[in-house]
Amino acid sequence: MIAIFLFYNKTNGFQSIFSTKGIKHCNIICYDGQDFVIFGLEEHGISFRRIKAKSTLKIMRNIKVIESLIGMIVVHVDEPKKITWKPFWVRSCNELCRYFSGVDIGFTFNPYHLIKKLLKYNNKRNYQVLSVWSRNNGI
């Protein structure tokens, strides 16, 4: 599975008070071989939408026009880790991204912590980082 982690410098959620380094929010696009689906934490719950695109490269190129997007990490997940859903434990954007992708990195406190763990455990767990992009050294 391909997972594209997207990081933003704007949000309207209260969890942003725990964010650091100007990285306030994240969401994820997953590709399972048939469909691209974007998942995100919205004000009133979890949202997901199918994206019609011919390739991961097209999505990466076109999504960069979003002004608040400051970084992107693309990973290939070999075998998604089965993570027990704990809805009352944490409902943050970074944890939802971790759940949906199946990356084996353990708990993440905020989007910045998610970035650090994705880069730290590259090729050491169940995924490989394929690409890292940032706007003005965003990540």
Residue ranges: model-predicted function:
Residues 1-139:
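Cysteine-nucleophile amide-bond enzymes
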